[in-house]
Amino acid sequence: MTIYLFLTDRMKRGGYVYIMSNPKNTATYVGVTASLLIRVSQHKDKINPDSHTAKYNITKLVYYQGFHHIEEAIAEEKRIKGMSRKKKHLLVSALNPEWKDITDDVIE
């Protein structure tokens, strides 16, 4: 019974879809997470040196969107990943025209 309640509670957890970029805004990464600040810190700290984000110095959080359910965030991640580079650029630019690192603006 406890395990079932734990799984049910986790399924109701919210989540975030996010886009990160390198300093010159020539490489991006789209991801999804339940804990945005922790995940962004992992990218910035390059905890996996062989990863795409570490290899291309993708350390700036330039876009994020929160959802009440992690499944919604996953669906949005898939939608964004299916976009062309130009459409991703327009998505970020609409909310963050200067492509600044907005990590300090995150409210979880």
Task: Please give the residue ranges for each predicted region.
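Residues at or immediately preceding the N-termini of alpha-helices
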Residues: L36, H69-E71, R85
